[in-house]
């Protein structure tokens, strides 16, 4: 999702009858009241400036058309930044693992599953697991590198360049200690 605090002036693409570039906008800061300046703009208070007439927009855009951020991949030192990297990185890593295992003898069956709806209850993973009935599963995902200035020590669950993070528990799962130790 989007953090409404950072939407102003973000470039987006409206995926309507054709892709349309736009810029997120809201009331200009120099005409806002003091009260308006002191609060966070809600996502429904933004508009998208396409530079087109209202009639042209109505021809090309329907209610419900998806909107994505317009962001190119950039290199930042030895890191990269782009939109939607979390799931894409996990897919890349999983494909590379399967390539590395392709010609190796392993004493068990390995399934690589790419699933959907993780954020709303692991629906895709649940469906895949019920069809495969695995002895154990390893989920790949990303987490925050919270080694930022001002972060308290207990908030630093992982650090950039610190290696793989292995989850022990979250709000839905407590991982088996044997699996955690194995990994």
Tell me the role of every PLM-derived stretch.
Residues 1-183:
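N-terminal hydrophobic/helix-forming segments and targeting peptides
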């Amino acid at each position: 999702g989007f953090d409404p605090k950072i939407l102003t002036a973000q470039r987006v693409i409206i995926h309507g009858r054709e892709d349309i570039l736009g810029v997120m906008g809201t009331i200009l800061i120099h005409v806002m009241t003091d009260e308006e300046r002191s609060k966070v703009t809600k996502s429904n208070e933004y508009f998208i400036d396409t530079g087109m007439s209202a009639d042209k927009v109505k021809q090309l855009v329907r209610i419900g058309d998806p909107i994505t951020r317009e962001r190119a991949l950039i290199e930042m030192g030895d890191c990269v930044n782009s939109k939607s990297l979390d799931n894409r990185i996990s897919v890349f890593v999983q494909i590379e693992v399967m390539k590395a295992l392709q010609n190796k003898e392993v004493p068990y069956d390995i399934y690589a599953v790419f699933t959907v709806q993780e954020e709303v209850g692991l629906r895709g993973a649940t469906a895949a697991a019920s069809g495969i009935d695995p002895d154990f599963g390893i989920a790949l995902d990303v987490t925050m590198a919270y080694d930022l200035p001002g972060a308290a020590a207990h908030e630093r669950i992982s650090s950039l360049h610190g290696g793989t993070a292995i989850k022990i528990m979250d709000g839905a799962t407590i991982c088996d200690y044997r699996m955690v130790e194995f990994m």
